[in-house]
């Protein structure tokens, strides 16, 4: 069977590329080994935001009297929260499939194996393609900390499906994923400790905003250990023991559950990538140019596999550029103004350069900061202590 475009991976990059290519008049084959939607739809952006919305609603209900709304007794039902999350995910996955089917994209479920740039096998079938787009995404990175294999730790997948709340939770990693889970579990009454190797949470975000968010969650009971390196892990009857060292010396945290949230890395194994001999970056991602072209003609890479920006909206834009390249349309990828949002409560967001990045790059800049109290609308919702900076 022959196609003009073969796409491996059905996440935001893959399904966007498939739809765009099909609308451009190309015959398209999309191969996905798990559920359509990728990490974002199944175990990332969407399920976490669904849980966070429930937590935010619960938090608002607890403080409703502040707005002259009396709710005698406020409670939550964790199994129902998890069930609602799963329902939302299922509905959106079906929506992706329906859209692809409506655009005559051929969808094959299974593990793809690349034979060469024009040949891909899946199960007993072999497919030929004129163009190959790789959208295999990323996977959770678990650092080789001594004792990690002996600890019953959570990844984000486990945290998304847990129907029982631990009394305490230690989170290794204070990035976006770590902080969103810290927000969720803290809102539901779990004692949370965040251990972060950097000197501030949410690396890459504006440091002042990150510090403000940390201060707010410190008030709410979350404990932060910054500039702290985890040196060992162990399991006891009481829970996981996180041994660490920092400028103050050595110490440990004991928690009923441990969430490993150090980061993600591109998926480069298990689908025959080595048969293409693509040029890779120092960190193992696939090197591409501004048209999403790799070092091999007619082979494109989009999404987390590029290693640039592990965000769904970045992947969508990369997919558009890749398809435009195949169709001969003038387009180029730019990473200058990619928005980033942390869906904690309160949320923080940013786009473009931060003061730190502008200073590092030698860019002359001016900063304008404005308290949210200047906005009458935001003042009505008690957001007066928040901040906007340009």
What are these regions (language model features)?
Residues 379-390:
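Single conserved hydrophobic/aromatic residue that forms the stacking wall/gate
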Residues 8, 128-137, 255-263:
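Short hydrophobic core segments
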Residues 1-10, 167-172:
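Beta1/beta-strand and adjacent pyrophosphate-binding region of the FAD-binding site
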Residues 164-197, 204-205:
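Rossmann-like NAD(P)H-binding beta-loop-alpha module
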Residues 149-165, 252-327:
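FAD-site-proximal beta/loop scaffold in flavoenzymes
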Residues 2-3, 19-26, 31-165, 193, ...:
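Glycine-rich flavin
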Residues 349-381:
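Structured beta-strand/loop patches that form or line metal/cofactor-binding pockets in enzymes
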Residues 5-29, 181-186:
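N-terminal Rossmann-like FAD-binding beta1-loop-alpha1 element of flavoenzymes
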């Amino acid at each position: 069977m022959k196609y003009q475009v073969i796409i491996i991976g059905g996440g935001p990059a893959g399904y966007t590329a498939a739809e765009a290519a099909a609308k451009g008049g190309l015959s398209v084959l999309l191969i996905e080994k798990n559920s359509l939607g990728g990490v974002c739809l199944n175990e990332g952006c969407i399920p976490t935001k669904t849980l966070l919305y429930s937590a935010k609603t619960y938090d608002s209900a607890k403080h409703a009297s502040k707005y002259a709304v009396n709710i005698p007794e406020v409670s939550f039902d964790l199994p129902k929260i998890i069930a609602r999350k799963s329902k939302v995910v299922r509905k959106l996955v079906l929506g992706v499939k329906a859209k692809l089917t409506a655009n005559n994209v051929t969808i094959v479920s299974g593990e793809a194996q690349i034979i060469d740039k024009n040949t891909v096998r899946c199960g007993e079938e072999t497919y030929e393609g004129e163009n190959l787009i790789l959208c295999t995404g990323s996977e959770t990175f678990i650092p080789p900390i001594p004792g990690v294999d002996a600890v019953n730790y959570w990844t984000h997948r486990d945290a998304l499906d847990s129907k029982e709340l631990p009394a305490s939770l230690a989170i290794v990693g204070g990035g976006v994923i770590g902080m969103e889970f810290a927000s969720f579990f803290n809102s539901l009454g779990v004692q949370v400790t965040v251990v972060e190797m950097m000197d501030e949470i949410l690396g890459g975000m504006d440091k002042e905003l990150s510090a403000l968010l940390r201060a707010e969650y410190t008030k709410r009971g979350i404990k932060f250990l910054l500039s702290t390196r985890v040196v060992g892990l162990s399991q006891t009857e009481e829970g996981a023991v996180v041994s660490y060292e920092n400028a103050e010396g050595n110490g440990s945290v004991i928690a009923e559950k441990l969430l490993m949230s150090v980061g993600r890395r591109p998926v480069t194994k298990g689908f025959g990538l080595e048969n293409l001999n693509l040029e890779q970056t120092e960190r193992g991602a696939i090197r591409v140019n501004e048209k999403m072209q790799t070092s091999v003609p007619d082979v494109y890479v989009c999404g987390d596999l590029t290693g640039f920006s592990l965000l769904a909206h970045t992947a969508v834009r990369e997919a558009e550029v890749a398809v435009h390249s195949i169709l001969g349309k003038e387009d180029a990828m730019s990473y200058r103004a990619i928005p980033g949002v942390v869906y904690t409560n309160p949320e923080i967001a940013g786009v473009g350069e931060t003061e730190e990045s502008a200073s590092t790059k030698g860019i002359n800049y001016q900063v304008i900061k404005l308290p949210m109290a200047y906005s009458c609308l935001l003042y009505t919702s008690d957001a007066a202590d928040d901040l906007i900076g340009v």
